[in-house]
A protein has these predicted regions:
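Structural signal for interior beta-strand "rungs" in well-ordered beta-sheet cores
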Residues: 3-196
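Long, leucine- and charge-enriched amphipathic alpha-helices
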Residues: 195-229
Length: 229
């Protein structure tokens, strides 16, 4: 009576579920999963085998924790062959995960989301990503495999981050930023490729003036080629 399990939910073998946890209808909990105390899994959440959730974790409907990482090799026969993803996902205490978000299991080791981090809807975290403590990741952002995000970072909506990078603690990435290199700590970046916010703002302002500037250059060119006309 210390936990609640909704209708049509399947819980695999050797799972450990903490007191006060509420698992909604139609969830699928794989073998060997650990779920801490006072967690809330809404309807149709999938937690795949051996993944670990801390206490007071909330996961919104349709999220998938521990899906296979995206790993393939080209075989000798000219066809892609899947690489086994044998790691897990580990969510710290007080993590929130939004609806239809997917967090891939590590190829080896762990994909980690640190305590207190808040993840919005429709987020993709690739295999072996490490997100620090008390970060915020807003809707439709994606982080490719093996990237590390420091504590207290803020990632706004529709940000794309390449793999094997380091995003500094307390950094801020503006909406639609494309990140292809490391980001320092305590900075605000924006645009593509990601640049310091002031630089990116100047670039955007200059870009808006480009059509008029092109017309002016064409007019000057005509005057030089046909003076007096």
């Amino acid at each position: 009576d210390k936990i609640h399990v909704g209708a049509y939910t399947c819980i695999g073998a050797h799972c450990v579920i903490g007191d006060g946890t509420d698992i909604g209808n139609g969830c699928d909990i794989g073998d060997g999963v650990t779920i801490g105390e006072n967690c809330r899994l809404h309807a149709h959440v999938i937690i795949r085998e051996r993944c670990k959730l801390g206490s007071r974790v909330t996961i919104q409907p349709g999220a998938v924790i521990g899906s296979d990482g995206f790993g393939f090799l080209m075989g000798d026969n000219g066809r892609y062959v899947g690489i086994d993803q044998v790691g897990i996902v580990e969510l710290g205490d007080d993590v929130d995960v939004g609806a239809n978000t997917t967090i891939d299991r590590a190829r080896f080791g762990r994909t980690i989301v640190g305590e207190g981090t808040k993840i919005d809807n429709l987020i993709q975290l690739g295999h072996n990503v490490v997100v620090g403590k008390h970060c915020v990741i807003v809707a439709q952002s994606g982080i490719a495999g093996s990237t590390q995000v420091g504590d207290y970072a803020t990632i706004a909506a529709q940000v794309g981050i390449s793999g094997h990078l380091k995003i500094g603690s307390k950094s801020v990435l503006g909406a639609k930023t494309g990140v292809i290199s490391d980001i320092p700590e305590n900075v605000a970046y924006w645009g593509f490729p990601a640049s310091p916010f002031k630089d990116a703002s100047r670039q955007y302002a200059a870009l808006k003036k480009l059509p008029a500037l092109i017309k002016e250059v064409h007019a000057l060119k005509r005057n030089l080629e046909s003076p007096g006309k």
